[in-house]
């Protein structure tokens, strides 16, 4: 007997098999008829037999259905079936195929009665069985995730999110839901989306003061951490910068963590390394369901061929294994600048000359992680003025703060974190020096240092960047269902 998920519908229970549930029961011995629903990935008619590959989005693997052809009516019926159509299939029988790539297949002996066409497609349905570039697929936001390559990245995203939840729960973190609407700019960069209503003449009339979409939930997390000790969130964040690059979005998701009783940057980096390695280990253990079975060339203007599946799969597996097995390095920002200057002056010039006191550029980050260390690297202790106001100042004379960025090969920075300044007077002086809090808009934040404060710190992980890196696709537009950038209008 096949086991299926059971749902309540209209007061009655009914069972529904999925493609994934069939793969999970490959060793069954039941001869019961099988019913399943899905979309046609491909169909091929030969002289006496037809092969139909069905997908339903639950598995990276399609379901092979074999249809013996016994008369012309069956042939004519199958000729109307096309890629992308929705089918409801009944009375299929299980056939074990242990010596083939797919360990089983379904067989239908009366396709006219057993196959019901539920949803047709138009004559110009764009997702035919042919090579398509990622650039082209991005122009099809309502259909692109029906492809094997892009649906797999969403399943990976779902899996990784679930693994984070399990890990944090096991380690006594509380998941919280901080607000999206805020009156503050956490990063101090001024690149904010201001919120107004369609009936209010000014942006401040609804809430009584200017209100924005959050760029980070960190300030609110600090409030909650001082009650819960350990908390985390996965929330949408918004930045109104004009960057249209493979690494930037106007709307993205940030996994943010805040912990009390943290006294050193090393405590934060050790926790980050342990956490990420735990997530990667779970991915490796489930690689058969996570690794895509189709790849699309990163050369988006070249639509001539698909890349070798085995080669691409091995590259992803190697990346995952290296994240676990390779040494993660730890250097200061000052050390990083020295390394970059030597490369810039002695080997080849960067586009942006590395200078102490200036933020690291993407090319610098990629060189450090991808060429110099060839592994993840934590860069710590940045100059104070390179970073936001809330970071804890180091006791050293070099005017740096206790912070870190995690750089990974091929992508650059994916995580940033810091100790938070818990000294009331130092925090006030820093904000005054930056011209902040002149109207008392951050008094609530500063006052936390007077009401049972504790040493604390945390970090934020750009979720799309992390998923893109794991998947081997370094354009984060493909790691979020509906990407938003300044370069493209929002049509829905």
From Swiss-Prot:
Species for this entry: Saccharomyces cerevisiae (strain ATCC 204508 / S288c) (Baker's yeast)
A GO biological process held by the record: asparaginyl-tRNA aminoacylation
GO annotations of cellular component type: mitochondrial matrix; mitochondrion
CDD domains from the UniProt entry: AsxRS_core (cd00776), EcAsnRS_like_N (cd04318)
PROSITE patterns, per database record: AA_TRNA_LIGASE_II
Keyword Kinase: no
Enzyme class: ligase
Catalytic activity: tRNA(Asn) + L-asparagine + ATP = L-asparaginyl-tRNA(Asn) + AMP + diphosphate + H(+)
Family according to the record: Belongs to the class-II aminoacyl-tRNA synthetase family.
Main location: mitochondrion
Function: Catalyzes the attachment of asparagine to tRNA(Asn) in the mitochondrion.
EC number(s) given by UniProt: 6.1.1.22
Keywords: Aminoacyl-tRNA synthetase, ATP-binding, Ligase, Mitochondrion, Nucleotide-binding, Protein biosynthesis, Transit peptide
Miscellaneous comment text of the record: Present with 784 molecules/cell in log phase SD medium.
Subcellular localization: Mitochondrion matrix
GO molecular function list: asparagine-tRNA ligase activity; ATP binding; nucleic acid binding
Domain of life: Eukaryota
Protein name: Asparagine--tRNA ligase, mitochondrial
PANTHER family hit by this protein: ASPARAGINE--TRNA LIGASE, MITOCHONDRIAL-RELATED (PTHR22594:SF34), ASPARTYL/LYSYL-TRNA SYNTHETASE (PTHR22594)
């Amino acid at each position: 007997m096949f086991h299926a998920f059971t749902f309540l519908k209209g007061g009655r229970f009914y069972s529904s098999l999925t493609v994934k549930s069939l793969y999970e029961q490959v060793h069954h011995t039941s001869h019961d008829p099988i019913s399943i629903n899905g979309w046609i990935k491909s169909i091929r008619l030969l002289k006496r037999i037809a092969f139909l590959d069905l997908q339903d989005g639950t598995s990276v693997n399609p379901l092979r259905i074999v249809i013996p052809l016994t008369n012309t009516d069956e042939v004519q019926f199958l000729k109307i079936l096309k890629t992308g159509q929705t089918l409801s299939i009944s009375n299929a029988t299980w056939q074990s195929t242990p010596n083939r790539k797919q360990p089983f297949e379904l067989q239908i002996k009366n396709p006219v009665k057993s196959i019901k066409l539920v949803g047709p497609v138009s004559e110009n349905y764009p997702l035919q069985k042919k090579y398509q570039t990622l650039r082209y697929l991005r122009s099809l936001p309502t259909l692109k995730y029906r492809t094997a390559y892009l649906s797999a990245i969403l399943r990976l995203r779902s899996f990784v999110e679930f693994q984070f939840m399990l890990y944090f729960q096991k380690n006594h973190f509380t998941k919280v839901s901080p607000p999206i609407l805020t009156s503050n700019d956490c990063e101090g960069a001024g690149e904010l989306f201001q919120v107004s209503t369609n009936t209010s003449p000014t942006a401040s009339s609804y809430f009584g003061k200017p209100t924005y979409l959050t760029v980070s939930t960190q300030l609110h997390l600090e409030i909650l951490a001082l009650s819960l000790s350990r908390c985390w969130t996965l929330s949408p964040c918004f930045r109104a910068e004009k960057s249209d690059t493979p690494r930037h979005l106007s709307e993205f998701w940030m996994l943010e963590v805040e912990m009390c009783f943290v006294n050193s940057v090393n405590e934060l980096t050790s926790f980050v390394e342990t956490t990420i390695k735990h997530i990667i280990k779970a991915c490796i253990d489930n690689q058969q369901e996570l690794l895509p079975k189709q790849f699309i060339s990163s050369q988006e203007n070249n639509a001539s061929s698909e890349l070798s599946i085995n080669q691409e799969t091995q590259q992803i597996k190697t990346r995952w294994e290296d994240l676990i097995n390779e040494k993660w390095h730890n250097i200061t920002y000052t050390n990083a600048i020295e390394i970059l200057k030597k490369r810039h002056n002695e080997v080849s010039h960067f586009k942006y000359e590395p200078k102490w006191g200036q933020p690291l550029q993407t090319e610098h980050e990629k060189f450090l992680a991808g060429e110099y260390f060839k592994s993840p690297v934590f860069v710590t202790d940045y100059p104070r003025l390179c970073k936001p106001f809330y970071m804890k100042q180091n006791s050293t004379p070099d005017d740096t703060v206790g912070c870190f960025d995690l750089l990974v090969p091929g992508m650059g920075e994916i995580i940033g974190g810091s100790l938070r300044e818990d000294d009331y007077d130092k925090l006030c002086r820093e904000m005054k020096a930056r011209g902040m809090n002149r109207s008392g808009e951050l008094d609530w934040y500063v006052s936390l240092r007077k009401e049972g404060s504790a040493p604390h710190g945390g970090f934020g992980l750009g979720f799309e960047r992390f998923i893109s890196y794991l998947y081997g696709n370094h354009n984060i537009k493909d790691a979020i269902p509906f990407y938003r950038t300044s370069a493209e209008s929002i049509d829905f």
